[in-house]
Amino acid sequence: MSAGQQAVVLARLQAVDGTPQDKALVAAWDRLFAMLNVLDSKTSALLRFNAIVVAALAYLVVVAGADPFAQSKPLIKTLGFAVGHVSLVLSVVSCGFAFPVIGVAHGLFDAAPGLDDAVIARLGAVVTRRTWLYAWAWRLAVAGGVGFALLVALATIH
């Protein structure tokens, strides 16, 4: 079923042809899609944050001429090296968890037109999965960001 056909079916159920059960299904559909919209928005902001952290960390970790620990004691140099690399990996893995959250969901409707409990269950499963992915992306981004802040502090204080 095309997106246009889906929209027409939902509009008919909500406006004219729908029973109270149909209208409840449409309301559930709308609520679940609103949740996906919020996840998309939050994930977009998280990916922007990760882009900044990854770019900064990649510059500090990969570009040898910008080594802020060149004149540091071996312990500080090793600690900075480890924190920088771990933070970079955490931020990149965070992006890996975030990208599926903003993907397009296919196959919610089966061949039969209409909205039923199975369609709502499939959409609910998509929301649940993407919420789980976003939660992990957020945790990893926070860990990567904290690592970046620690790296900056080490480079500044040493």
What residues fall within each predicted segment?
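Phosphate-binding glycine-rich loops and adjacent basic patches that engage nucleotide phosphates
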Residues: 1-3, 16-18, 85-93
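Serine/threonine-rich low-complexity intrinsically disordered regions
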Residues: 2, 19, 44, 73-74, ...
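Short, compositionally biased low-complexity segments
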Residues: 2-11, 95-103
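Short, charged cytosolic
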Residues: 3-28, 110-118
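Alpha-helical transmembrane segments and their immediate juxtamembrane boundary regions
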Residues: 27-30, 34-107, 135-158
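Short membrane-interface loop/juxtamembrane segments of multi-pass integral membrane proteins
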Residues: 28-29, 35, 113-134
